Design a protein with these regions (language model features):
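Bacterial Sec-dependent N-terminal signal peptides
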Residues: 1, 5-50
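N-terminal active-site segment of His-dependent metallophosphoesterases
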Residues: 47-115, 208-209
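Extended active-site neighborhood of metal-dependent phosphoesterases/phosphodiesterases
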Residues: 58, 105-226, 241-247, 251-263, ...
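Residue-level marker for buried hydrophobic side chains located in beta-strands
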Residues: 64-66, 97-99, 136, 228, ...
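Generic beta-strand structural signal
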Residues: 66, 99, 277, 316-318, ...
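Active-site flanking residues adjacent to catalytic metal/cofactor-binding acidic residues
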Residues: 68-69, 101-102, 183, 230, ...
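C-terminal structured domain segments across diverse proteins
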Residues: 233-234, 269
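Residue-level signal for glycine
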Residues: 330-332
């Protein structure tokens, strides 16, 4: 970036010196004026860009990435965001990546050797600092393929950590602890269970068993911070069918409220949203797509929303929990802050 600034600055200096020689060449002068305007615009963008020092300020004792809805074979914003995640990781030092579903669009994967594992994942997230544990959940697009292959890929890749369809993972360091509870949301939603030709594995999963597990896991959790992650939202602004959220509100939300979890985070909607619900202390978070986003507008309960693509950085200390929305330029466009 320093080289870019220097080069642009040199151009502007040279332009000012040679400009008098173009007084009679109106077309060239106009071109130079346009080019100067462009250079000034680029310099303004560079001035607004986030630096490694800015990224370092986002961190806590424990730090994590969360990304989702990225499986586009590297197209759209997937590759640039993956490269950004790698550069930022040098400063943020995340413990892991929480992958909140739809790593693979559009029909999931057929097997552990499906080429999509390379084009959607391995070859895209190839930065050395992304060679760390990834903890995924299944999204609706994974449910269009072979969901067991997504679990079995843990036997192929050393960084793919998926012991079950739903599971939890605790981290602790220097007196700070956080538990991520990762749930399998597609089988909780009626329309996926009923569309057996399109989502063949959804109806085979027990809703009751998963809800009992969720309740008992949260009952036993003693960490400073509890973050529940699923692919589908409980509350969100979206054009998707309302029954998806109604099913999540009926099945999942009462358990989360009972145990007063800190954050419920999801993907699926392809934009950034932070919502609160009356009578609940939970921060409901929609993490944007790390490839291709959609428009969004505020609704009742909206604290923030943005159509930007990107990912999130979660940072925890003993007294605070922050979730930062990061856009594709590396800028923290919004922060959800919780304190004790």
């Amino acid at each position: 970036m320093e080289h870019l600034v220097a080069s642009l600055s040199v151009f502007l200096c040279v332009h000012q010196k040679i400009r008098p020689y173009f007084f009679s060449l109106s077309k060239i002068e106009i071109t130079m004026q346009k080019l100067t305007t462009l250079i000034l615009f680029l310099l303004a963008l560079v001035a607004q860009a986030q630096t490694p020092a800015d990224w370092k300020k986002l961190t806590g004792t424990l730090n994590f990435y969360m990304c989702n809805d990225m499986g586009r074979n590297g197209y759209y914003d997937q590759k640039p965001i993956a490269e950004l995640m790698g550069r930022m990781a040098e400063e943020v030092d995340p413990e892991c990546v929480i992958a909140a579903g739809d790593v693979h669009h559009f029909y999931g994967v057929a097997s552990t050797t499906d080429p999509l594992w390379q084009t959607n994942y391995e070859l895209v997230y190839s930065h050395p600092d992304l060679m760390l544990p990834w903890y995924p959940v299944l999204g609706n697009h994974e449910y269009r393929g072979n969901t067991q292959a997504v679990l079995d890929y843990a036997q192929v890749s050393r960084r793919w950590m998926m012991p079950a369809r739903y599971y939890s993972k605790s981290f602790s360091k220097d007196g700070v602890s956080i538990r991520f509870v990762l749930i399998d949301t597609a089988p909780l939603i009626t329309r996926y269970r009923e569309e057996t030709a399109k989502y063949p594995d959804a109806c085979k999963q027990s809703i009751e068993r998963q809800m009992q597990w969720l309740d008992s896991t949260l009952t036993a959790a003693k960490e400073n911070w509890i973050v529940v992650v699923g692919h589908h939202p409980i509350y969100a602004e979206t054009g998707k069918t309302v029954t998806e959220r109604q099913d999540m509100q009926r099945l999942v939300d009462p358990i989360l409220r009972k145990h007063k979890v800190d954050i419920y985070a999801c993907g699926h909607i392809h934009n950034f949203q932070h919502l609160r619900s009356e009578g609940s202390s939970i921060d409901y978070v929609v993490n944007s797509a790390a490839a291709l986003s959609r428009k969004v507008k505020p609704i009742e309960g909206t604290q923030f929303c943005s159509p930007a693509t990107g990912f999130s950085v979660i940072s925890a200390t003993e007294k605070s929990l922050n979730l930062h929305f990061i856009d594709k330029e590396g800028k923290a466009i919004y922060t959800i802050h919780r304190s004790k």
